[in-house]
Structure formats: structure tokens, C-alpha cells
């Protein structure tokens, strides 16, 4: 298997995309395939550049055994060259990514996270930033399901 590079993208890179990165990293690690994947996350905005994930997301992630150590970074046009798949959390992310894509090849690298869900059905991964505790739990549930589906999709 060739190395696959996957970039998860949300708005600020402090809740959903770093969580998706951690979930997918765990799945890859548990299957002994860490050397076969490059996994990262980014945000469409640079507002939180350099910050750790939101403290609430880190708390709920830790309850499930995930440790979010990623520091937020903004999406860069060069990410189209550096990643095989760029996975957005909601339609706003997808639209912003498509607006940055300069070629059909770049546009074809863009996917919706929820399209990989197997057991849960959702139209997007909602941003939990302005919501309550249950929103963070729901996001992790969606991401665990979608990341498992993504792993299966890649026929690993």
C-alpha cells in the first residue's frame, strides 16, 4: 500500500478537525499502519493559529482516551499538493475549499466527512463551539463513525 495523506478541515482547527485527526490516527495505529499514513488537520480561518484544541474538546476527547496535542494552523493552498484527500466537516468548509481549488484535480481531492459515516446519518459535522457538552459528545460520535468508514473506504 502506498502512503496516503489525509487532511481534515474545519473552520478554526480547534474542535472538529483536530478531533478527526486524533480519531483517524488511533484507527491507523491500532491497525499497525502508522507508516502508511500522513494525517493532519487545518482550519479555514487563521484566528486560532498556534493554539491547542478547545479545552472542552480536549476534555471530552480525553474521556474517550484521545489526547489532542495538535496546534491550530490555517489551510494553505499548498495543502492541495501535499495531501491526497482533504476532508471538510460541513458545507461551509467544502465551499471554502472548492473556492480555493485552482484545478479540477485539486477539487477532486475534497470530500465531506459525513459521506464516510456507516452507522450514523448526518448532513454535516456540526460545530460544537457555541453549544453545550452534548454537542462535543455528538461530534466525537460522528467522527468515530466517519473515520471508521473512511478507513474501510481506503480498503486498508
Predicted regions and their residues:
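Phosphate-binding/catalytic loops
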Residues: 85, 91-156
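Acidic pyrophosphate-coordinating catalytic loop
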Residues: 46-51, 79, 89, 102, ...
